[in-house]
Amino acid sequence: MKLFAGNAIPELAQLIANRLYTSLGVAAVNRFSDGEISVQINENVRGGDLFIIQSTCAPTNDNLMELVVMVDALRRASAGRITAVMPYFGYSRQDRRVRSARVPITAKVVADFLSSVGVDRVLTVDLHAEQIQGFFDVPVDNVFGSPILLEDMLQQDFNNPIVVSPDIGGVVRARAIAKLLNDTDMAIIDKRRPRANMSQVMHIIGEVADRDCVLVDDMIDTSSTLCKAAEALKEHGAKRVFAYATHPIFSGQAHANIKNSVIDEVIICDTIPLNSAIKALPNVRTLTLSGMLAEAIRRISNEESISAMFEH
């Protein structure tokens, strides 16, 4: 087994390597003077079981191209098997044509791209839509960040907690968390989204008054939805609001939104690196998925079950 990393998430890649008691492979991933990506593998990988750790977060296209160029370099160096470890899978929200609009299904384009350059397997975390696994012609292991989030929740001193889904689509996730969080109650926020990256909270289904609310979602983008949800919960009498999510995209006005919000704490995972402004916010805390991803990589390399990691 050998691990390689692009430039997207070097800190997480190093943590994973540390967990596996190994070092990252020797590779130079740079840029030519015109901006094109330059990759050179500086060690023997012939016949090796190789893992490339690279989230396709912003800058999405650069990180995606780094990944596929690294795959091609390793494939041409006679790699035995290549697994793309993508903690965050970019373009995952473009997974369907809503009302047959004239738009691409970009998640499928990316899946085809990865397959065509020689990826043998994909390991990712909390795909925005699980059916994206079917877009690939190679096996996809979609592991979950919820055990890491749940472990943190169980360590908190919540006062009469209630798990809250920020929308109808997140009900299954919220219900699973609520069951494992001592079978606590659940609430749902019904919202209307007038246009992309904008949302308006409509009403809350469930009783949140005098309770600590635990919002759970797969990702936080501009955080507009999250902050308005927190406002609605506080208006309905919630004592405190905690927001848990796997992927901290934090684009656009996310920093200002969170800084000025009524959210008591935002807890996210390290699938995407945070900028310095977000890191400086006192109510943002990061959990690492390095242990879980290291175990998944070990199991893949040893041909062991991934699903067994999540059997309760």
Swiss-Prot record:
Keywords: ATP-binding, Cytoplasm, Kinase, Magnesium, Metal-binding, Nucleotide biosynthesis, Nucleotide-binding, Transferase
Family annotation (Pfam families): Pribosyl_synth, Pribosyltran_N
UniProt: Mg(2+) 2 binding residues: D167
Cofactor notes: Binds 2 Mg(2+) ions per subunit.
Pathway: Metabolic intermediate biosynthesis; 5-phospho-alpha-D-ribose 1-diphosphate biosynthesis; 5-phospho-alpha-D-ribose 1-diphosphate from D-ribose 5-phosphate (route I): step 1/1
EC numbers, comma separated: 2.7.6.1
SUPFAM superfamilies: PRTase-like
GO biological process: 5-phosphoribose 1-diphosphate biosynthetic process; purine nucleotide biosynthetic process; ribonucleoside monophosphate biosynthetic process
Binding site for ATP: D34, G35, E36, R93, Q94
Family matches, as InterPro entries: PRib_PP_synth_CS, Pribosyltran_N, PRibTrfase_dom, PRTase-like, Rib-P_diPkinase, Rib-P_diPkinase_bac
GO cellular component labels: cytoplasm; ribose phosphate diphosphokinase complex
Family membership noted in the UniProt record: Belongs to the ribose-phosphate pyrophosphokinase family. Class I subfamily.
Subunit structure: Homohexamer.
Cross-referenced PANTHER family: RIBOSE-PHOSPHATE DIPHOSPHOKINASE FAMILY MEMBER, RIBOSE-PHOSPHATE PYROPHOSPHOKINASE 1, CHLOROPLASTIC
Protein name: Ribose-phosphate pyrophosphokinase
Taxonomic lineage: Bacteria, Pseudomonadati, Pseudomonadota, Gammaproteobacteria, Candidatus Palibaumannia
Encoding gene, per UniProt annotation: prs
